[in-house]
Amino acid sequence: MPSFDTVSEANMVEVKNAVDQAGKEITTRFDFKGSDARVEQKERDLTVYADSEFQLNQVLDVLTNKLVKRNVDVRFLDRGKIEKIGGDKVKQVVKIKNGIETEAAKKIVRILKDSKMKVQASIQGDAVRVTGAKRDDLQDAMALLRKEVADLPLEFNNFRD
C-alpha cells in the first residue's frame, strides 16, 4: 500500500548559511557601521542584537531576505518578544520551528477525513503518515494539503510503494 510522510522541517544547513550571509552584509552595510547589530545562532534559536528597535527590524529584514534566497520558508520562524538589554540596546530571540505540532497534525488528519478521499492519515510523532490504495489518491491528498494548510510549510517525504 503506497504511503508518504507529511513533515515540517527547516534545512538547518541553509539556515546557518543564511545567518552567515546576513552577518557579512550587516558588517559591511553603511547604516550598521559602529553599531552592535548581529545575529547569533545556537542550534534552533537565532538571537538578533541591535542598538534600537528600528535597527532590529532592519536586521530581521536582512535575515529574512537571506533565508528566502536560500529557499528556507519564513513560516518556520517564531519571533519572541523584544527585550531591552541595557541602554537603548535590544535583542530578540527567533525560534526555528521543527515538526508538526499536535494541533496542526489533528487539523491535517481532519482535512483528509473530511475530503472523503480514499486515504488514511495517522499521526506519527511530529509527522503525519498518509496511506492510500493508489498513488493517484496520494497525489490528490498532497495537492489538497498544499492548498488547505497555508500556515505551515509542509514537505512530503519517505515515499513507499
UniProtKB/Swiss-Prot annotation:
InterPro entries: DUF520, UPF0234_N, YajQ-like_sf. Keywords: Nucleotide-binding. GO terms for cellular component: cytosol. One of its GO terms (molecular function) is nucleotide binding. The keyword Nucleotide-binding applies. SUPFAM superfamilies: YajQ-like. It holds the Pfam family DUF520. Belongs to the YajQ family. Nucleotide-binding protein. This is Nucleotide-binding protein HEAR0865. It comes from Herminiimonas arsenicoxydans.
